[in-house]
């Protein structure tokens, strides 16, 4: 798999590199935040999947046209950081000390102040998790899986027990009532802090 995490250029010609080589079975994906670019790219060469950040605390794809484009064009969507870079697991709070070299140290959402204010979102996940006999991480992933059948989150981990926990999310059933409750409660929570510092955010197309 060849994948570019950076924003792609705005011309259809620049999208000709977004190709599938069936003979070599090499898949090329790209990520973007632009509905019109997705449609134009798809017209030049059918797009297989888009990857973008999406989770309960990063919901841009719902409003920037990306999910609409995927549904209209039959494109798969692969959310990265579906657990909010670890925050939505419930394992962090304002007292959490990130180690040297931890990329999250430069992220506005991981300041102690932001972690404290965003705790309301984790509390919501913990409450639903208690009702479902699951973990906050499993609820966060189950919520994503329940959005659309063509959404496939990719939580990263280096620990076997976390992998098993993540896989368990597929067994969590969220009813329409559960999803409506999560939506209502999450809508009342204002997420504190941008995803990235300004200089990095500018490269994502938001």
Give the residues covered by each predicted segment.
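Beta/alpha (TIM)-barrel catalytic core signal, keyed to glycine-rich beta->alpha loops juxtaposed to Asp/Glu
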Residues: 1, 5-184, 189, 199-206
């Amino acid at each position: 798999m060849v994948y570019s995490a950076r924003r792609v250029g705005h011309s259809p010609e620049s999208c000709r590199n977004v190709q599938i080589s069936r003979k070599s079975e090499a898949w090329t994906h790209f990520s973007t935040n632009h509905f019109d670019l997705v449609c134009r790219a798809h017209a030049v060469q059918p797009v297989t999947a888009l990857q973008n950040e999406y989770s309960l605390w990063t919901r841009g794809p719902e409003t920037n046209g990306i999910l609409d484009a995927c549904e209209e064009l039959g494109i798969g969507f692969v959310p990265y950081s579906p657990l909010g870079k670890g925050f939505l697991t419930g394992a962090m709070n304002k007292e959490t000390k990130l180690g040297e070299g931890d990329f999250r140290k430069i992220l506005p959402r991981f300041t102690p102040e932001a972690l404290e204010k965003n705790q309301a979102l984790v509390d919501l996940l913990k409450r639903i998790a208690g009702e479902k006999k699951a973990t906050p991480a499993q609820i966060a992933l189950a919520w994503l899986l329940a959005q659309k059948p063509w959404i496939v989150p990719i939580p990263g981990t280096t620990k076997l027990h976390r992998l098993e926990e993540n896989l368990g999310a597929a067994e969590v059933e969220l009813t329409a009532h559960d999803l409506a409750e999560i939506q209502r409660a999450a809508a009342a929570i204002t997420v504190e802090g941008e995803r990235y510092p300004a200089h990095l955010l500018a490269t994502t197309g938001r």
